């Protein structure tokens, strides 16, 4: 008699691997060998994103620009928070934000559309900033602004003069995002044991010190 053997090799998450091992433990015809040491692998492990349900829809954007490597940080949560925050700051309106939230939530629950989930999250931030701005369906005299009126609020900027407050805050927030991204790059370099890149890359420690000093100088 000729015996036929099938050999299957692949990657599994630890949770799935343990479940698979449990399923086949009583099958004498199946022999399973598991290796959890990445150093022995000839190829780099694939990346599987794992995020809370609230951030799941934003994985679409991460996959669009390329998945992080196995040892790198998953930026989904950061993308979700910053995207929703920036959208809300730009489109702050209680009424319209509420429509986006409800419409997005309905489509996400019924059609399971990732984009609808993103719109729903953005709608929540839009409502929040709508209260901050005192805007309701474009009318700014219905609600009292908790924070400021975007079109009228001005502030003094050294060496420049008076500028719109929202414009100045947007620039400051953009600088903050750049600094955070540099920190992420440093963390990824350390995880990949690339010390040279962590210290001397333009988006690592060297760039962080240079850019951070400029930001502090301008701020002071």
Show the residue positions of the predicted features:
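Conserved, carboxylate-rich catalytic/transport cores that coordinate ions
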Residues: 18-220
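Coiled-coil termination/hinge junctions
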Residues: 1-20
